């Protein structure tokens, strides 16, 4: 009969090597994934910083009837940078999402997959929060520009309702603001100049909002769909923590009871020994 011991040993070593290779590959994959997570988080933080800077530029522009071109250019650069960075974040989150869906399609389930899903959901929510803040900042700036236009129209003697002003803005025609205004004073000319400036700012703003709208809605819908999953994960984590705390408490009680039982056992043994000595002494005395 042929001895297959060496063959089986070689096959086992080969299987062990394969297991090690798979583990190393998986660890390397997760390391690369966490590097990607940190990169995305850095991009989101950068957007948040730029949004705060945009707010400061808005205030500076509104504080001046005729803001300098440098400030306006810096604002446009910030908005352009936010758009580019947001598109990068969206693309990377989409890539992670597709990778997760592929593994789910193969019915794979692992701790690594759950970690990736949780990280993806967390980043998506943070991204939408930052972009929501940016959207709110833009909307607030539009309202403030609109208020300045309305006040300047009043200076020229032209009163408009909010609805009428909105219609004028939507027309996209700056000449509509000059109709009915008598340009017979420097005040009227200055007021019209600021109106045109604010109208130009609103047009740029609306273009920016329009460009980001589809991306924002896409990510918002993704986060909403993930809401239930996140809630389930948080529920399971909370209950797992409760379970662990109860287990620790029960273990402490068990140790305490075990310690008491051990002490009782020792005391009983000591009593038995003493009793044995007494009995032995008594019996010895009787026979003596």
Swiss-Prot record:
<dbReference type="GO" id="GO:0009629">
    <property type="term" value="P:response to gravity"/>
</dbReference>
<dbReference type="InterPro" id="IPR010989">
    <property type="entry name" value="SNARE"/>
</dbReference>
<keyword id="KW-0964">Secreted</keyword>
<feature type="modified residue" description="Phosphoserine; by DAPK1">
    <location>
        <position position="188"/>
    </location>
</feature>
<dbReference type="GO" id="GO:0030141">
    <property type="term" value="C:secretory granule"/>
</dbReference>
<dbReference type="GO" id="GO:0030672">
    <property type="term" value="C:synaptic vesicle membrane"/>
</dbReference>
<dbReference type="InterPro" id="IPR006012">
    <property type="entry name" value="Syntaxin/epimorphin_CS"/>
</dbReference>
<dbReference type="GO" id="GO:0030424">
    <property type="term" value="C:axon"/>
</dbReference>
<keyword id="KW-0597">Phosphoprotein</keyword>
<dbReference type="GO" id="GO:0031965">
    <property type="term" value="C:nuclear membrane"/>
</dbReference>
<dbReference type="Pfam" id="PF05739">
    <property type="entry name" value="SNARE"/>
</dbReference>
<dbReference type="GO" id="GO:0032940">
    <property type="term" value="P:secretion by cell"/>
</dbReference>
<dbReference type="GO" id="GO:0098839">
    <property type="term" value="C:postsynaptic density membrane"/>
</dbReference>
<dbReference type="GO" id="GO:0098978">
    <property type="term" value="C:glutamatergic synapse"/>
</dbReference>
<dbReference type="GO" id="GO:0005886">
    <property type="term" value="C:plasma membrane"/>
</dbReference>
<dbReference type="InterPro" id="IPR000727">
    <property type="entry name" value="T_SNARE_dom"/>
</dbReference>
<dbReference type="GO" id="GO:0045956">
    <property type="term" value="P:positive regulation of calcium ion-dependent exocytosis"/>
</dbReference>
<dbReference type="GO" id="GO:0043008">
    <property type="term" value="F:ATP-dependent protein binding"/>
</dbReference>
<dbReference type="GO" id="GO:0042802">
    <property type="term" value="F:identical protein binding"/>
</dbReference>
<dbReference type="GO" id="GO:2000463">
    <property type="term" value="P:positive regulation of excitatory postsynaptic potential"/>
</dbReference>
<protein>
    <recommendedName>
        <fullName>Syntaxin-1A</fullName>
    </recommendedName>
</protein>
<comment type="similarity">
    <text>Belongs to the syntaxin family.</text>
</comment>
<dbReference type="GO" id="GO:0031201">
    <property type="term" value="C:SNARE complex"/>
</dbReference>
<dbReference type="GO" id="GO:0001956">
    <property type="term" value="P:positive regulation of neurotransmitter secretion"/>
</dbReference>
<keyword id="KW-1133">Transmembrane helix</keyword>
<dbReference type="GO" id="GO:0005829">
    <property type="term" value="C:cytosol"/>
</dbReference>
<feature type="topological domain" description="Extracellular">
    <location>
        <begin position="287"/>
        <end position="288"/>
    </location>
</feature>
<keyword id="KW-0175">Coiled coil</keyword>
<dbReference type="GO" id="GO:0008076">
    <property type="term" value="C:voltage-gated potassium channel complex"/>
</dbReference>
<dbReference type="InterPro" id="IPR045242">
    <property type="entry name" value="Syntaxin"/>
</dbReference>
<dbReference type="GO" id="GO:0030073">
    <property type="term" value="P:insulin secretion"/>
</dbReference>
<dbReference type="GO" id="GO:0006886">
    <property type="term" value="P:intracellular protein transport"/>
</dbReference>
<feature type="cross-link" description="Glycyl lysine isopeptide (Lys-Gly) (interchain with G-Cter in SUMO)">
    <location>
        <position position="256"/>
    </location>
</feature>
<dbReference type="GO" id="GO:0044325">
    <property type="term" value="F:transmembrane transporter binding"/>
</dbReference>
<dbReference type="GO" id="GO:0070044">
    <property type="term" value="C:synaptobrevin 2-SNAP-25-syntaxin-1a complex"/>
</dbReference>
<feature type="transmembrane region" description="Helical; Anchor for type IV membrane protein">
    <location>
        <begin position="266"/>
        <end position="286"/>
    </location>
</feature>
<dbReference type="GO" id="GO:0072657">
    <property type="term" value="P:protein localization to membrane"/>
</dbReference>
<dbReference type="GO" id="GO:0033605">
    <property type="term" value="P:positive regulation of catecholamine secretion"/>
</dbReference>
<keyword id="KW-0268">Exocytosis</keyword>
<dbReference type="GO" id="GO:0070033">
    <property type="term" value="C:synaptobrevin 2-SNAP-25-syntaxin-1a-complexin II complex"/>
</dbReference>
<keyword id="KW-1003">Cell membrane</keyword>
<dbReference type="GO" id="GO:0000149">
    <property type="term" value="F:SNARE binding"/>
</dbReference>
